[in-house]
Structure formats: C-alpha cells, structure tokens
C-alpha cells in the first residue's frame, strides 16, 4: 500500500478564531511548525502567510542583513531568502544565513578570515578563486609538514541560548596526499576556557581500531566537512565571548599537500 496523502481540511475548529489570535499563537512556534500548521486548514494556510508571524521568526536586527538592492513582497519571502542566500559581510570574508527549520543564525568564516600557519608564504599555501566557493578565494595547500588552522569569532553574531557545531569545509585535489591515516587534533571552545577536543581525519582511510576519529562527510554543495566540536552560546548581543576553533597536526610532521580549505562553518547542532 502506498503512503496516504495528507489532505487539507476544508474546515477546522479553529476557523471560528480571530485571525490575529491564530497568528499570535503560531508566532510562538518555529518556522517548521508554522509550515506544518499551514496544511491543517485553509484558515491556517492563509494566516501563516502573515507578516506578523514571519517577523517574529526573523532575528531582531534582520534589517542589517538585507542587501540594499533587494526588495521583498513579504516577511516570509525575506525569511526564506535569508535561509537560501547567505549574506556576505566583513569585507566579504564571512557569510551569515538562517537555518530554515529554526531561524537560528549560521555563520561561515572564509579561509581568508582564518589564521593559517605559513598561509602568507606561496611556497606552502596558494590563494586561488574557484567558482564553487561562496568567497573570493580559497586556500590551497601546496606543501607543509606543520599543519595548523585556527579561527575565531565573537558570539554576538550567533543566536543566543543555542548549541552550535563547528565544521571545517574542504576539498581534496587529485594529487592530495599526506592525510591518510593521519589524525588531526581539533578543538572548539570559549577563549580562556578549556575547549572540547577530538581527533579528526581529512581522509576516510583510517586504521582500524581508531573509532574515536571523526571522518569527513559529503555536503549537498559538493564540498566535504568534518565536525570539529560543539559549544553552547548562552549570551546575546551584549555578550563579548569569543569562540576559537582549531585543527592541527604538529607531531607526526609528514609532508601534506593538495587540500583546499573554503572555511569554517558554524550552525546549530543536531539534536539526537
């Protein structure tokens, strides 16, 4: 038997409620639940289009995220634009967008915004433009033994009271080598406090028995990513904490080549 198709009800007990009352109730949910509510009845479908609801789902400073050249017909259209089209800022070295299901802020630091040891020496790292990156340039590893990448960001640009995960976003070229069976030390935490630590590997080839090593995963945009760790952002716009994320290999010191780094992405952690 096939799956039953959800049929939108022509009438609902809520049809007798004032529309502003329904809007008020739905505004205390989240974007995903609001879209589900729109399938309940025609009354809900109409109400969920209200600007009152979608403005509640937008961050308080959403106007600063709107490109000057863009005009939106509704707050709902604006919301989904901020979900689907990351906004570049800070000299186009960072991008911010909203997680579609929750409306929480997501952030990506470009490779140009990271601290990469020997990154300013073309003998070791090369800065190149590639069409599949959202940023002007990415970092291409030419040849190093000492591998160290660090990134920092103020928590004010993130959503408060939210657990986040940080990911390093990368690709490997055909001649990429030096990362097979090499564990990279990753750390994420508030600057000045003890960070959470783990081992990661840029290659899926890792020795058996090392189950604690986090492997890369394929992204929908064609890049690969590895989770560096998690942190909880408690504060809001008045909070002045900084989060530092790092990935380094400074012990084995074998030659490494061919990795392309787009940046570090921070987004709400998955709830298991």
From Swiss-Prot:
Task: Answer whether the UniProt record assigns the keyword Transcription regulation to this protein.
Answer: no
Q: In which pathway does it act?
A: Protein modification; protein ubiquitination
GO molecular function terms listed in the Swiss-Prot or TrEMBL record: carbohydrate binding
Q: Which residues form the F-box domain?
A: 11-57
Sorted alphabetically, the Gene Ontology BP terms of this entry are: protein ubiquitination
Q: Which Pfam families match?
A: F-box (PF00646), PP2 (PF14299)
Keywords, ordered alphabetically: Ubl conjugation pathway
Among InterPro entries, the record links this protein to:
F-box-like_dom_sf (IPR036047), F-box_dom (IPR001810), PP2-like (IPR025886)
State the oligomer form and interacting partners.
Answer: Part of a SCF (ASK-cullin-F-box) protein ligase complex. Interacts with SKP1B/ASK2, ASK11 and ASK12.
What is the stated purpose of this protein? Component of SCF(ASK-cullin-F-box) E3 ubiquitin ligase complexes, which may mediate the ubiquitination and subsequent proteasomal degradation of target proteins.
Q: Domain text from the record?
A: The F-box is necessary for the interaction with ASK proteins.
Q: Under what name is this protein listed? A: F-box protein PP2-B10
User: What is the species of this protein?
Assistant: Arabidopsis thaliana
Organism phylogeny: Eukaryota, Viridiplantae, Streptophyta, Embryophyta, Tracheophyta
């Amino acid at each position: 038997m096939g799956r039953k198709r959800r049929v939108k009800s022509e009438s609902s007990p809520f049809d007798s409620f004032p529309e502003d009352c329904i809007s008020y109730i739905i505004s205390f949910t989240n974007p995903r639940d609001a879209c589900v509510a729109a399938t309940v009845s025609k009354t809900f479908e109409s109400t969920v289009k209200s600007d009152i609801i979608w403005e509640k789902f937008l961050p308080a400073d959403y106007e600063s995220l709107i490109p000057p050249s863009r005009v939106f017909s509704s707050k709902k259209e604006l919301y989904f634009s901020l979900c689907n089209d990351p906004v570049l800022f800070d000299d186009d070295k960072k991008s911010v967008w909203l997680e579609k299901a929750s409306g929480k802020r997501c952030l990506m630091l470009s490779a140009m915004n990271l601290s990469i040891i020997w990154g300013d020496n073309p003998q070791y790292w090369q800065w190149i433009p590639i069409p599949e990156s959202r940023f002007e340039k990415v970092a291409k590893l030419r040849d190093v033994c000492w591998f160290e990448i660090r990134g920092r960001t103020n928590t004010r640009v993130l959503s408060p009271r939210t657990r986040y995960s940080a990911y390093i976003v990368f690709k490997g070229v055909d001649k990429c080598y030096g990362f097979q069976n090499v564990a990279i030390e990753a750390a994420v935490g508030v600057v000045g406090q003890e960070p959470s630590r783990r081992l990661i590997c840029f290659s899926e080839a890792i020795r058996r028995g090392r189950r604690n090593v986090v492997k890369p995963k394929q992204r929908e945009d064609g890049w690969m990513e590895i989770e560096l760790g998690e942190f909880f952002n408690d504060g809001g716009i008045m909070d002045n904490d900084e989060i530092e994320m790092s990935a380094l290999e400074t012990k084995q010191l074998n030659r490494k080549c061919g990795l392309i780094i787009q940046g570090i992405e921070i987004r709400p952690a998955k709830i298991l």
